């Protein structure tokens, strides 16, 4: 007699089950959405404040920085050692300009010590004109120790220690060096003497007692005490004079 209530009760069961299913599905959706929002917000915070990632990031930074510094220091030390080695063995390193105020090649002594054509250490006009050998008088090409065209220790054009036509050992007009102890090439024991004001054995700047390669007291290429082709101690064409 109450059997007609069974379909009514089943209807309510289906309605209640459907409503419960919808409510549970809504709750599931809310939970899913909240999980997505929570994950989106928590992921950066986890990366920033993670007890694992934060120390790992710091350690990685220090390791990379230390490795870079070590490599840079190693390369610098190797380059410095190589530079010092090259400098030690005398190889000048490239791209190393001289410091400011350092002397140049033009400032070094002896770089411009002589005029054009002179030998090192000679100045034009001191001991010889440009191109002359040291100690030669004007009239380039003469050997040192000789006056212009004359033998060493004599006046211009005269023999050693004597004027043209005069006795060996006497200057023209009785200049100093006449008697014993006279000019080069005169009597024994004669001091090397030339023209007035001359250095020992020749004109100013000449070497004493003759040019290079000449015998002492002789004219150019001559024997001691005589001119080329003349008798010893005599004037041109004259007889041998006795010692005074």
Curated annotation (Swiss-Prot):
It is a multi-pass membrane protein. B- repeats lie at residues 118-121, 132-135, 142-145, 206-209, 214-217, 222-225, 226-229, 231-234. Coiled coil: none annotated. One of its GO terms (cellular component) is pollen coat. Inflorescence-specific expression, especially in buds and flowers florets. Present in pollen (at protein level). GO terms for molecular function: lipid binding. It is found in: Secreted, Extracellular space, Extracellular matrix, Pollen coat; Lipid droplet; Membrane. Residues 94-244 are annotated as: Disordered. Lipid-binding oleosin involved in tapetum development, especially for the physiology of tapetosomes. Also implicated in the formation of pollen coat. Belongs to the oleosin family. This is Tapetal oleosin GRP-16. The gene is GRP16.
């Amino acid at each position: 007699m109450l059997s007609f209530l069974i379909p009514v009760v089943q209807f309510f069961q289906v309605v209640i089950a459907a409503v419960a299913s919808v409510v549970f599905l809504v709750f599931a959706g809310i939970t899913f959405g909240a999980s997505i929002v929570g994950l989106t917000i928590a992921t950066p915070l986890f990366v920033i404040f993670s007890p694992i990632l934060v120390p790992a990031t710091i350690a990685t930074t220090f390791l990379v920085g230390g490795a870079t510094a070590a490599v840079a220091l190693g390369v610098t030390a190797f380059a410095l050692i190589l530079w010092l080695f090259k400098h030690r063995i005398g190889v000048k390193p490239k791209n190393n300009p001289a410091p400011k105020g350092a002397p140049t090649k033009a400032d070094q002594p002896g770089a411009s010590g002589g005029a054009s054509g002179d030998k090192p250490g000679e100045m034009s006009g001191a001991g010889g004109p440009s191109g002359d050998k040291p100690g030669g008088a004007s009239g380039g090409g003469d050997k040192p120790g000789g006056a212009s065209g004359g033998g060493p220790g004599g006046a211009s054009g005269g023999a050693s220690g004597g004027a043209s036509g005069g006795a060996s050992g006497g200057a023209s007009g009785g200049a100093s060096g006449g008697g014993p102890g006279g000019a080069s090439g005169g009597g024994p024991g004669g001091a090397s003497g030339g023209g007035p004001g001359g250095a020992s054995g020749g004109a100013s700047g000449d070497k004493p007692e003759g040019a290079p390669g000449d015998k002492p007291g002789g004219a150019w290429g001559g024997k001691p005490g005589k001119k080329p082709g003349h008798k010893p101690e005599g004037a041109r064409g004259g007889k041998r004079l006795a010692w005074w």
